[in-house]
């Protein structure tokens, strides 16, 4: 286990950072390139552990993929070019890889087995495996196909009209990918809008998709064609430095080339509601995704209530929003966020336990948390990432305002999504 001691830094963070490529888009660029006919090139790929797991799985399925840091070349031969793997497909810590590849494997006329790390082994897969089974796939595993390892025997599927009980982009994506090879039409209706990278990118790869409110539909039998994909910066990674810039005194941080897809940009709305001085410049569309440069300055912050339809648009940012709330005046209530319980950790419990160690006034609720602020954060303690990249980074940012140094345990988890996180933090401290 790697540990990192973070020295408080209330003198201000200054500088310009280019955050790593978007994790969601990096996964999909490799997957869709593997399903397409022709060559797909990817620029700005995130070479984090999760996305490397996706590359490894598709290489085992017989796809030629070359990766050199942020550039990837996928030589796709279409769906029929995928081959039965001679080895188990190891998804590592990646929930995205697991759920999306389930949709793909369900259509293929061979047997495959998925395993992952200890965290993946606790994450519920029935939300994906049940609709795929109803389409005709054979999937088995622990807890009646709810937990990895999972065994999949795919084949000819039938389209489905699925009403999702939870707002999950991974579930929606898995069913749509299965629908691409199913007989007839497949539709997914969500309870709330979730990230739409799958729909945007499938269209860029030549697939026709129908959208009607909260329903997305796809006709079976469509082919993908190789593309050139430029991956924008990940707003979920940018969120850590947006929060640091807003709450560390005397700070001004610019983050360039950040994806601001409205289905992901809830963090920007919350920052503005809390009173952050946030500027968005050089707005443009890049590969079908809206992108901008974001500049944040130290701000006087107010507590807010966060819940309802915005939650799927900032679910991954809640750990760092909780850190921000400790420095805002008044009460911040985060609700309707039960989905936090089935992330890499139960993020309601891990956020509350670790921020409590730092002296924050925070307590858990059934569907979120309540934070009172502003509170000085004490140091001289050890906090844990619990093996969760977003908890590790959130604690490192909180430590910047602590009264004494803070040791963060398990910082190797951060490499899942932001391998250069501490390098970027050191650069902002030194400028």
UniProtKB/Swiss-Prot annotation:
**What compartments host this protein?**
Cytoplasm
Q: Which residues form the signal peptide?
A: none
| Gene Ontology MF terms in the entry | 3-phosphoshikimate 1-carboxyvinyltransferase activity
Binding residue positions for phosphoenolpyruvate: 23, 95, 123, 170, 347, 390
Pfam families membership? EPSP_synthase
Q: Which Gene3D superfamilies match?
A: Enolpyruvate transferase domain (3.65.10.10)
Entry's family note: Belongs to the EPSP synthase family.
What function does this protein fulfil?
A: Catalyzes the transfer of the enolpyruvyl moiety of phosphoenolpyruvate (PEP) to the 5-hydroxyl of shikimate-3-phosphate (S3P) to produce enolpyruvyl shikimate-3-phosphate and inorganic phosphate.
Q: What is this protein called?
A: 3-phosphoshikimate 1-carboxyvinyltransferase 1
């Amino acid at each position: 286990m790697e540990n990192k001691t973070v020295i408080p830094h209330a003198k201000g963070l200054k500088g310009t950072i280019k955050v790593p490529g978007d994790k969601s888009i990096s996964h999909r660029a490799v997957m869709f390139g593997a399903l397409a006919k022709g060559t797909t090139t990817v620029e700005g790929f995130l070479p984090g552990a999760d996305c490397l797991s996706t590359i490894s799985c598709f290489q085992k399925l017989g796809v030629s993929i070359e990766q050199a840091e942020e550039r990837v070349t996928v030589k796709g031969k279409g769906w029929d070019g995928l081959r039965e793997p001679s080895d188990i497909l190891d998804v590592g810590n990646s929930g995205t890889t697991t759920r999306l590849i389930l949709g793909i494997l369900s259509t293929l006329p061979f047997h495959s087995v998925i395993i992952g790390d200890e965290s993946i082994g606790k994450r519920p897969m029935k939300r994906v495996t049940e609709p795929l089974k109803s389409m005709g796939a054979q999937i088995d595993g622990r807890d009646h196909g709810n937990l990895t390892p999972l065994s999949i025997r795919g084949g000819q599927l039938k389209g489905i009209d699925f009403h999702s009980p939870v707002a999950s982009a991974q579930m929606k994506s898995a069913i749509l990918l299965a629908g691409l090879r199913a007989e007839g039409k497949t539709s997914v209706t969500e309870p709330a809008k979730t990230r739409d990278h799958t729909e945007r990118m499938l269209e860029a790869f030549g697939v026709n998709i129908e959208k009607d409110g909260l329903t997305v539909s796809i006709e079976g039998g469509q082919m993908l064609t190789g593309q050139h994909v430029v991956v924008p910066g990940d707003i979920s990674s940018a969120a850590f430095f947006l929060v640091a810039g807003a709450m560390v005194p005397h700070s001004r941080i610019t983050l360039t080339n950040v994806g601001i897809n409205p289905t992901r940009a809830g963090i920007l709305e919350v920052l503005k509601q809390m009173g952050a001085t946030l500027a968005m410049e050089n707005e443009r569309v890049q590969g079908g995704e809206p992108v901008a440069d974001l500049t944040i300055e130290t701000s006087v912050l107010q507590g807010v209530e966060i819940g309802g339809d915005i939650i799927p648009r900032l679910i991954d940012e809640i750990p760092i929003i909780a850190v921000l709330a400790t420095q805002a005046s008044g009460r911040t209530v985060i609700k309707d966020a039960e989905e936090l319980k089935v992330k890499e950790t139960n993020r309601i419990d891990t956020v509350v336990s670790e921020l409590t160690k730092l002296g924050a006034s925070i307590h858990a609720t059934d569907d979120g948390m309540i934070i009172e602020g502003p509170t000085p954060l004490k140091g001289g303690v050890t906090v844990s990432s619990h093996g969760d990249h977003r908890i590790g980074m959130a604690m490192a940012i909180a430590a910047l305002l602590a009264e004494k140094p803070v040791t963060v345990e398990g910082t190797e988890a951060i490499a899942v999504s932001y391998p250069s996180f501490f390098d970027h933090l050191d650069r902002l401290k030194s400028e």
